[in-house]
Amino acid sequence: MSILKKTALAAATAAVFASAPALAYEAGDMMLRVGAAGVYPTSDSEEITAIAPGAKVEADDAWSLGITFSYMFTDNIGLGVLGAYPFEHDIDAKGSISSLGTVGKVKHLPPTVTLQYYFNNSTNFTPFLGAGVNYTYFFDEDTQGALSGANLDVDDSWGYAFEGGVDYNINDQWMVSGQVYYINIETEASVSAIPGKFDVDINPWVYFLSAGYKF
């Protein structure tokens, strides 16, 4: 190959790379993702002996609109915030009282902040991991069925959180994303018809599928 052809090929290659979008994240980048978030509890309450031996309650699964925001401090390290429209869970009787069915409802907001590490590479896929803290705010507690008319109160909680995810960068700005969180949510609840409080462990897996935009 002649020197002229080699030079022309090198120039063409450089032009292609110069015009290709820079898909890797950089310090100062901000990513906003919006999509569907699902909360899947993995635990239930302690035994509520004041009701009956073996009596327990459990929150069911719930989906809502989710949103995350990430800010990159460096090309690899960022800070992520998870928010959502309130999740609403049915509270189901379990154990020896499972025949009672749904005995209440509760809503919650789970704002979560994580320190994230992004594995930048030369592909359109950018995987990342994160760890941080969660605060869960419970509200609009209500009873129904066998507990109808009783007052239900669920305490807010603090806990740790882990996440893993991957962004597929369609171009330099738009992406689709999938994330999975494990969130430590351990709280206490009380019902006016039952003496004392009882522990409720929710500890959910949270699944988030979204579309995002990089600023």
Model-derived features: positions:
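Cleavable N-terminal export/targeting peptides
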Residues: M1-G28
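Domain-scale selection of a single, long terminal region
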Residues: S2-A12, D61-Y71, I77, Y85
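Short glycine/proline- and aromatic-enriched beta-strand/turn motifs that initiate or cap beta-hairpins
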Residues: A22-F69, V206
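Gram-negative (and chloroplast) outer-membrane scaffold detector with strong preference
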Residues: A27-D29, T42, T68-Q144, P204-F215
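Predominantly the C-terminal beta-signal and adjacent terminal strand-loop region
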Residues: E88-D92, N171-F215
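Outer-membrane beta-barrel translocator domains and adjoining extracellular loop/strand segments
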Residues: D44-I51, D90-S99, F139-A150, E188-G196
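Hydrophobic alpha-helical segments of small multi-pass membrane proteins
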Residues: P111-V113, L129-Y135, D156-V166, V180
